[in-house]
Amino acid sequence: FMKRKSTIWFVLFLFPMFLTAENNAFGVPDSSEIRSGLIETWFEASLMTVRENIPEIYSNKAGQEFQVRLEETDSSFNVFVSPHMTMNVDVYTENGKYTKKQDVYPGDAPGSWVLIRNKKDGKPIRIRYYFLSNSEVYIQFTPYNKTSLCDLVIFGNYAVKGIPTGVPFSRFYSASLAEVQRITKSNVPWNYLEYDPTLYHSVHQMAGVIRERLPNIVYHKDAMIDENDNLVEFGSGRPIKLEEGTEKLPLSSSGFIKWVADGLVEPVAGSKLKRLPLLTQTVEYKDIGYQGVLSQEYSLSFALDFVRNISSAVLSVNTGTVYRFNESGVDVTLEPFVAGLSENGIVNPVTFSNDSGYNINVLKSLFYILANSEPGVIYFGAIRQTDNKTPEVKVFNNN
């Protein structure tokens, strides 16, 4: 019994917009002209002086409001320039409940800018720009001698880290997001963040159909529908007999993936995918070593073999050309991250390993990039698990 998920393998199968003072690719409010007038009183003044400043509201040329305020932590003091937003708040009184709109200025809203300074000596630590509805994606700058360095963080992983900008750190006191993009266009993969909501109709439609049918499916170990529409055991092909009155479709996790794939290929090919080719082994183990010895008796890569083979099969149907796994190029091998954030600070992860896959810590970041760069594509995944024993056994299991 495998207790802990360790890595995962993926195979390829096939905000609101705002009126801005300076246009940027993300359509977020621009505070650059406001910030240019705050340098002496907010950005370079001593902590004691900044504490004397009260929160202030400014408007840019487009009429958008921003709040400038100070927030402190144990080790830093932070100056926020944050755009105006409204949120619904439920108010409870003796006469019942009503909802009112409240003005807010979130520090991590799209268009928000923050300067973080050291509390001991007042020196700047970093400047951060938020430009998406999800604040776990941001770009930041740190001072370095007479210039500055750039990081792009996507859900806790660095797409770039410590890239020289060639401009002084103080430039970002007043730089707009559009200017940031111009300064970093040759070093920062902005294409990872490009999103066109009109390109996802087919994926949303497919997800809606699957979600609608989920209540009629129940988990059953090793169960699948074969090419002859029979319910069989995935590994052996033996028929599975159901109790009378069974109304729901019993499927294993692999059987569910095949059910999805069959829904894609049957309208094109006129039949479901064959079971046996999906079991072809794609991983070779050395005869020596604990894993190698076990592989001679057990399938340690069943789920990985399966998703590779079924992805190749779907590709074959869609292109009209028969591809074996090693010819299909269906493995996702993108390595877009140079480092990651953890509770212990910055780590340097190996994001991809052949026949082992991705560390699970990069999945959210990876999916974000893939969703933006390859709209309309879906992915089948295999989870590699461990028994946490010594010697350790790691398998792509069929659950």
Ranges and model annotations:
Residues F1-W9:
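Bacterial N-terminal signal peptides that target proteins for export
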